[in-house]
Amino acid sequence: MVCLIAALLLFVGVQTTYAVIPELMGPLQSLIALLPQLLVVAAVGVGAVFSVRGWRTRIAAWRVYLSAHRTGSVVGVLVVGGIVASTVLLLDGRDVPGGTGRLRPGQDAPPLSADSWSTFRGDMARSGNPLDAEGPQVASTPVELGKEALRQAELYSSPSVVGDRLYVSSSGGSTFQAFGLIHCIDATDGAPLWSFKTAYKGFSSPVLAGGRVYIGEGLHHHTDARLYCLDAGTGDFVWDFQTRSHVESTPTVVNGRVIFGAGDDGVYCLDAGSGAEIWHAEGLHVDLSPSVVADTVLVGTGYGEMGVYVLDLETGDVLWSLPTEYGVWGSPSVQAGKAYFGLGNGDFARSDPEPYGALLCVDLATREQAWIYETKDAVLTAPAVVGNDVYFGSRDWHLYALNATDGTFRWRYDAGAPVLASPAVAQGIVYTASEDGEVAAIDRVTGEPRWQVYLTDAGYPQLRVLASPAIRGGQLFIGASEAGMFVIGDPGST
């Protein structure tokens, strides 16, 4: 039995845990996190039980026993050896990052263009509606992209697409060897170009800026996760920055600075070139992706003193805050002096026993709530604001459209499953995806579907969609956990 347990711990992967906001941490993960301390306590206990005086007598007795029980002794040595090896792997986990780049050293990064989808939500404003974004107008069969690198991977990260390259992170490994991988693949044929291994699984999405890739690592139970900066052309390591928590947040890069949430370690602002710390706002638990408006940083908190917080871009000081009754999970979108945040109970894995959700609109001039629209379950998505309309998804299985000025209802679309992906908008269409793999193009005005396709038709009935779609050049790119990366539409088919 002991051998069986040891083998399972060594070779069976962790049950998929969407340990993102709020905290989801299984008993086994808790035990693993405490393993170094437990080993120390065990060592002290052994030392207390066995006095120095009795060691010689016991060693002699052990020799006699081992000679009489050779088979059992071998098994015992294997079990102990396995535990020791696993512990070494666990404690040495911080040393695993490294690149496997295939491009030539010095290969140029793809230039950013007007139609680039360079970060989560398409641009640093988290709009979901970049200026020249174009998505597919008609349905087509989803094509699996990057099978060699991404097939059946855990994909919580949303892709970025710049030029003919797609960037995304995946998670994998087993209980004692879980890790993350940052990928760059050819967006046309899925050929792997380079990958970079991180010590922990990740939920953060890649940001392309200045020829570099910025991305965080870690889920809720990690306490020393890092933000990485890589060369976008080669995948070579440039610098990293270690926090005292997890970096599920997708960073924002603006004016030579990288700003990101680090869970209960607050918000950091780093120099984008060197990774040097500029400021650190402590005392906040931030998992969403910050937005920068003029000389301020907008974030929300889901634990502790829940609410909306506005920080000074230069110093990180809290300028003002607006308390909320429920956790703020949806990354803010800003337009015309108003910021829109998703609120609620529940998380990416399940609904809360007492579900609640809402979209909150905050007037940045008056520092007060402009309006709030309640839903039947949590709003974990970032809204897309286009003109006088705001679009967002909810765990209550619906995509909503509201008047952005006063929050009045326009329409809602029944997606048939929780909507955990943030919508993208282009050319009169709202693109959305449900957790069970339906991808739909919804008419912005009527709320009626123009087309629907199902990722499960590709042969992955158990897939889950947590990541958000990226649109560019008449195509839609989206990842599904336990499946892979898919592309819908032909280039230029708008």
Task: Name each model feature, range by range.
Residues 55-70:
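Membrane-interfacial, low-structure loops and terminal tails that flank and connect transmembrane helices
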